[in-house]
Amino acid sequence: MADGGRAVMDRDQMISLVERHLKAEGAGDVEGAVAVYTDDVEHDVVGWPTGPLRGKDAAREFYRHLTANFRTEDERPQHRYFAGDAMVLDQMMTGTVTGSMLGMPGNGRQITFRVLHVFEFADGLISRENVWLDGGAIQQQLA
């Protein structure tokens, strides 16, 4: 036990939970993507117009927008780092922009870009997700 008596998840549990989240997101399964979140989750895609979001309902709206505009086709982890109840995932993502992304029309183009996620966990669920996208690579491929 750590952090005031809360059980710390092990690495395999963290990886499994994040993979469930990403698989659901990639399949366009909004409910599955948020099912692994705590009710008071903080979801922050740095630079996204909405700013940080709080709670499952707000995250659900984000994923509805994302899955309506982007279809994930491949995710390749580059590195994973662990510290206490946190995991950093550095990955390459490939998908098709079916609508728009970062305010730019996708016109059905396939793009590949780097993504850095910082996940925090509480009570066996994801309590925080911060995401940094390689906006320059996205814009260059959509221009």
What are these regions (language model features)?
Residues A2-A143:
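C-terminal and inter-domain tail/linker signature
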